[in-house]
Amino acid sequence: MKQLTILGSTGSIGNSTLGVVRANPELFKITALVAGRNVHQMAQQCLEFAPRYAAMSDETSAKALRLILAENGSRTEVYSGEKAACELAAIDDVDQVMAAIVGVAGLPSTLAAIRAGKQVLLANKESLITCGKLFMDEVMHSRAQLLPIDSEHNAIFQSLPEKVQSQLGYSSLSDNGVSRIILTGSGGPLRETPLVQFADVTPDQACAHPNWSMGRKISVDSATMMNKGLEYIEARWLFNASAEQVEVILHPQSVIHSMVRYHDGSVLAQMGTPDMRTPIAHAMAYPMRVNSGVAPLDFCKIRELTFAEPDYQRYPCLKLAIDASNAGQAATTALNAANEISVMAFLDSRIRFTDIAVINRMVVEQLSLPEPASVDEVLVIDRKARDAAVQAIAKLNN
């Protein structure tokens, strides 16, 4: 039985992970749960899965959780803060760590799991977007095993040769017969919305994804295709791919989750019902296959599979991300930070949908920063970019 720590247990990925545990109680045991401030949901999770440890992001939330658990006779030990999250990511008894805390906030605990040599199920994009080289160097040094959770990267992983899977981030794609990785994206809920209407798009419209059930921030990223841009950056680090070896195409049905093209002309594609429990179950049980709780794909109900090139006028954030990837990690870190600020401002109705790309571009072009050589330097770039984004939003609103 595998012992599991979930970083970000109350989020979308965390809940899907618990769904896989629920479907396979004889295979997985929750040792620790880590979350932000959602005390009510964390209490429910602790009472159902009875972890030994739990941690909240602040002491106020931790106190509230302790009170609820004590009233219900739970023996779960509750801690708080970033240090606690890092310690729970590195517990000796834990086999796997689901790294699903969104944003740069998830970086320290994800690195703690890597340094402890754990099998890390990577759902935190920012680990590679902001610290790609540093992160992969830590993986090699600690001999931790990295398994991608994003549906696209997991699909690519499943379609790659075993040698590349076992040497993730360092194996040569070309030497193993791979010519190109093809990332698919649905195009989001605004794929057919006239461009003239983009300025009036509401947060609810941007979050109404046609295929996937996701959190609001990542739903907006899907609408702008920034999510695909960040996945492009992540894919280059995960699979040791050059810019020429990664391609992004639109696939509105979200049935093919990504593809790998080989030198001999073959293309291997991973397909399935769009449900995050599938890649999560694959990574949790790897190299075995277990019940994910997801309904099997019914090919007779699939009317068509269509593909198209992305339009950068419709998706300027995708182009920004590709350009940032070519520029380096200072640029990708700045872009990611600016995007987090601009998306939150949009969700709070403080800026228009079209302002997201404008702010992101302003920040990346404004900041000329050296390449980071440490995590601390990454965090400095992140902070400067966030400050610049806040200032850019203020200017737009004046």
UniProtKB/Swiss-Prot annotation:
Enzymatic class: oxidoreductase
A biological process from GO: isopentenyl diphosphate biosynthetic process, methylerythritol 4-phosphate pathway involved in terpenoid biosynthetic process
Gene Ontology MF terms in the entry: 1-deoxy-D-xylulose-5-phosphate reductoisomerase activity; manganese ion binding; NADPH binding
Keywords: Isoprene biosynthesis, Manganese, Metal-binding, NADP, Oxidoreductase
Organism domain of life: Bacteria
Catalytic activity, as annotated: 2-C-methyl-D-erythritol 4-phosphate + NADP(+) = 1-deoxy-D-xylulose 5-phosphate + NADPH + H(+)
Pathway stated in the Swiss-Prot or TrEMBL entry: Isoprenoid biosynthesis; isopentenyl diphosphate biosynthesis via DXP pathway; isopentenyl diphosphate from 1-deoxy-D-xylulose 5-phosphate: step 1/6
Cofactors that this protein relies on: Mg(2+); Mn(2+)
EC number: 1.1.1.267
Binding site for 1-deoxy-D-xylulose 5-phosphate: K125, S151, E152, S186, H209, S222, N227, K228, E231
InterPro entries the UniProt entry points to: DXP_reductoisomerase, DXP_reductoisomerase_C, DXP_reductoisomerase_N, DXPR_C, DXPR_C_sf, NAD(P)-bd_dom_sf
Pfam families in UniProt: DXP_redisom_C, DXP_reductoisom, DXPR_C
Residues annotated to bind NADPH: T10, G11, S12, I13, G36, R37, N38, N124, E126, G215
Binding site for Mn(2+): D150, E152, E231
Assigned protein family: Belongs to the DXR family.
Function summary: Catalyzes the NADPH-dependent rearrangement and reduction of 1-deoxy-D-xylulose-5-phosphate (DXP) to 2-C-methyl-D-erythritol 4-phosphate (MEP).
Subunit structure: Homodimer.
PANTHER family: 1-DEOXY-D-XYLULOSE 5-PHOSPHATE REDUCTOISOMERASE, 1-DEOXY-D-XYLULOSE 5-PHOSPHATE REDUCTOISOMERASE, CHLOROPLASTIC
Protein name: 1-deoxy-D-xylulose 5-phosphate reductoisomerase
Gene (name only): dxr
